[in-house]
């Protein structure tokens, strides 16, 4: 049985999807982009600012589901420019400090709202 996870501490869905779904002890998030949940506005700073906001949104969503960064088993990071890989890693490492999750990082041509990155995760409760 699946449970829909939703929180105002992460951006509302901008399409027909859930912020996250829990099935048993597993949590599957949708991609989080750097939208400031309180205002609905985009974080328009550099890649580091956008990464902080997007990953912060992801962690807020996981917390709502009874999870945390420590319980993430896999992330996928979509970035518009692979030249930003090192900067994203620098921010990513502030959220995932030990026993980092498995991760894929994919360069894409375009992302929703023309942001620089999007991050999704699979975690346990």
Which residue stretches match the model-derived regions?
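Short, polar/acidic, helix-capping and beta-turn segments at strand->helix junctions
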Residues: 2-125
């Amino acid at each position: 049985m699946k449970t829909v996870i939703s929180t105002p501490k992460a951006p509302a869905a901008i399409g027909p999807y859930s912020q996250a779904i829990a099935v048993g002890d597993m949590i599957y998030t949708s991609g989080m982009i750097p939208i400031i949940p309180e205002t609905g506005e985009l974080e328009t700073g550099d890649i580091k600012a956008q990464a902080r906001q997007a990953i912060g949104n992801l962690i807020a969503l996981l917390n709502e589901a009874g999870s945390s960064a420590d319980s993430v088993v896999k992330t996928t990071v979509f970035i518009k420019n692979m030249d930003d890989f090192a900067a994203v890693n620098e921010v990513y490492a502030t959220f995932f400090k030990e026993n980092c999750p498995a991760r894929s990082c994919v360069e894409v041509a375009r992302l929703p709202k023309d942001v620089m990155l999007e991050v999704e995760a699979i975690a346990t409760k």
